[in-house]
From Swiss-Prot:
Subunit-structure text: Part of the 30S ribosomal subunit.
UniProt keyword annotation of Plastid present: no
Listed name of the protein: Small ribosomal subunit protein uS11
Family, as annotated: Belongs to the universal ribosomal protein uS11 family.
Pfam families referenced in this protein's UniProt entry, alphabetically: Ribosomal_S11 (PF00411)
One CC-aspect GO term: ribonucleoprotein complex
Gene coding for it: rps11
UniProt cross-references to HAMAP family, sorted A to Z: Ribosomal_uS11 (MF_01310)
Source species: Methanosarcina mazei (strain ATCC BAA-159 / DSM 3647 / Goe1 / Go1 / JCM 11833 / OCM 88)
Record's keyword annotation contains Ribosomal protein: yes
Length: 126
């Protein structure tokens, strides 16, 4: 247990795509990266839970080859004045990492939330 080597998995999940980037614990060096378009060719499948599971499985293999056996997860939705809930791929990716035998430390939500930023798109509602 003392020889745990940790990394950080940044999962950006929207309703159009899911991007997973794995960095070292400081976030400076990228260890592995995958997006929906690298796994499936149809644009409609990029954000699906199945694609996210495939991506996480591939990344787990790469991490094991590099000697990393634990990850902290940071989930991010589009945020800002867009949607604040992550897409369908986020939860599937987390489950796939756990099933692949990678130990999960922390899971945190890092979606950017505006402190009364720009006006949201769409008409006025009365």
């Amino acid at each position: 247990m003392a020889d745990m080597k940790w990394a950080v998995a940044h999962i950006k999940s929207s309703f159009n795509n899911t991007i997973i980037t794995v960095t070292d614990i400081t976030g400076a060096e990228t260890i592995a990266k995958s997006s929906g378009g690298m796994v499936v060719k149809a644009a409609r499948d990029e954000s699906s839970p199945y694609t996210a599971m495939q991506m996480a499985g591939q990344l787990a293999d790469q991490l094991r080859d590099k000697g990393i056996n634990g990850i902290h997860i940071r989930v991010r939705a589009p945020g800002g004045n867009k949607q604040r809930s992550p897409g369908p791929g986020a939860q599937a990716a987390i489950r796939a990492f756990a099933r692949a035998g990678i130990r999960i430390g922390r899971i945190e939500d890092v979606t950017p939330v505006p402190h009364d930023g720009t006006r949201p798109k769409g008409g006025r509602r009365v």
